[in-house]
Amino acid sequence: MIDEKQLISHLYQNRENGQWMIQTNDEHQKGVADMAASFAGQFGLPSWGRALGLLHDKGKERAAFQQYIRKMNGLPTSDKKRYDDHTHAFVGGILAKEFMGKDVSHLLVNQIISHHTGLHNFGDVENILKERLLSEEINEGDISINKPLLFQEFIDSPFSKSKVEWEHFHHLSRMLFSCLVDADRLDTERFMDVESWRKRGNSATLADLLPQLEAYMQKLQSNAADTKVNRIRQQVKEQCSRTSSSEKGFYSLTVPTGGGKTLSSLLWAMKHAVSHSMNRIIIAIPYTSIIVQTAGLLKEIFGEENVLEHHSNFDPNDIKDEENREKAKLATENWDYPIIVTTNVQLFESMFSNKTSDCRKLHNMANSILVLDEVQMLPTGFLQPIVDALKAYQEMFGISVLFTTASQPVLSGLIEGTNPKADFKGIEHIKEIIPEEFALHDQLRRVKLAIDDTGRTYDEIAAKVSEYNKVLCIVNTRKDAKELYDRLPNDGVKLHLSRMMCPAHLHETIGKIKTLLKDESQPIVRVIATQLVEAGVDIDFPVVFRQEAGLDSVLQAAGRCNREGRSAMGHTFVFSLAAEKRNPFGSMADSNNARLNLPEDSDWFAPSTMKAYFCQLYSRKQTFDEKDIKHWLYKPTELCFETASKEFHLIDDTSINVIINWENSMELIEQLKESGCTYSLVKQLAKFTVGIRSYDFKQLKGYGLVEEILEGIYVLADRSQYNKATGLSLDNHWLEEVLMI
């Protein structure tokens, strides 16, 4: 018989013997407090984590909640009173405000009342509390709290004796929220779902994994030919190894394409982490197309049990080993893995989110290394809040940041924009790992760059491209890709790449290109692509064409040319389309104009030229905070977490996903119709999904070409509108792609 005075937090009935298994509220709160204290201890605030844990579920001790949890689970109760409200989170918020004082309640109250709903705007917190009858709610039932203990916990906190920059205050609030949310979910899982709890953790440490990386790189070196390129790669590797024990902070690794940046940056990160006892490495990449390549390499080195992919196109069901598959599914919730590979979108939108599911992982970023690959792809419209966030995480949470690229943007110092509000305030000090005297841009110069600003027709460009047998042509829009692809002759293999192809076909085509380029029996391979291939995709053509764009894009395109130095010099041609055609617009026009404003005799590959280019580009910007995140978050008394979360989106989130009814997806679509929407089905179908602009979607829907099989889930009804080689179209008019970063 269960004691009716027992204060229950969670319960379930054992299926084998029918016995009721109960976790008391005291047990749960202490479990959460211990875990949250451990998490917050990573950045020096264990007492704050403990206070959050001890207070967060005090409202479960209300008679209303105790009656509710018993009735919901079929447990008898003698309490026949009718209660209008059985919610519980607000009580802990009231206690935090009552017992901890005005100065700190802003930090704790919101986290506690929001641990199931997501962080509220500051003004809404007061309104939520005012709606409650404070004294009646607190005194109802047996709600007890050790007030002296909590005060002592707070007094002992180092934060009470330190200062936080006001503009960083929201990051501290969100980080403490993360500690509470993850601790709450984990302690609940430990009681309610022991099987899942046991699958978590138990991954290797970075110290365990470092020898595997060193052995892999040594094997590569031993099997590599004695070429100039390979000698430079070894030089870069050794420099990364030498500098890895430097103090925590901001670092950049600027290495021309083909210089071994991926592995050398990983070596630096792992050795830096081991020397500072850091927890994990988080690698953020702009394109999902690059992630598959990078994650594949890391899994080859460390095993899939130590590398977590977390992005929209990854389906954990693709992991063959059941134990690793289940671990990966669980780890996407909180990033408790040694190595995480994710997108800029997943990373930065989580850092500015108010949602429990997004924020839960954030505390595991503390005392970690963040590698931002292809950093020049960070959107300038969000650059100021992103840089401010990185500074906050470095100063308060002990991370190190490594910026890697062949085209390093200017992220330090002050750059004046078109008006005072457009000034960009960068990071005070970023240390470059590769010294200037290495002159890598000269040593790795394997490409001649020719720029022709004369407006050319599609026919002229197609004819020029067709003069070469193995050639890549990168253009700015889907329209341009269509026009040029159609004009190429069919005398060999011609391929197309854009995001109007579903991820399954896109990755299949990239793999096919890599295979064909190694096949000497296939003399003609011509590829027309949008800019998705120009950063990080490991392909190597002797000749590359690039439609006019910013200097960073031009050099990234040149990085797909003669990467391995197989010929003395590769050739990259920059071309312009005739005025009536599709020339750069919007931000692409800003980038192109910044390049055009540089001296014609510039050394396009020199780091000094790249710096001048970015200064030109930034000086043209109206703002580096286009959604005014500073307004919503930089004043502690006006923290608008929910509003900022809705505003901070790096890509156009008005796009609509359409599932392509094609081959393997057909069976999955039928399952979706029969069984409804499940996490597993959504992840599997993501590989056969294309995101399109709302305008184009309206056209498809207007013609009856898409079918809504479930609310908000659309399938292409007319398969003739999709071509595996070229993607989704509307009556042969190719739609524009949505840029995915």
Protein language model annotation of sequence segments:
Residues 10-16, 309-322, 476-479, 494-514, ...:
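Conserved helicase motor
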Residues 344-347, 358-396:
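SF2 helicase catalytic motif II
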Residues 394, 459-468, 474, 479, ...:
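C-terminal helicase lobe and adjacent C-terminal extensions/tails of nucleic-acid helicase motors
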Residues 278-302, 311-314, 410:
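Conserved Walker A/P-loop ATP-binding site and its immediately adjacent core
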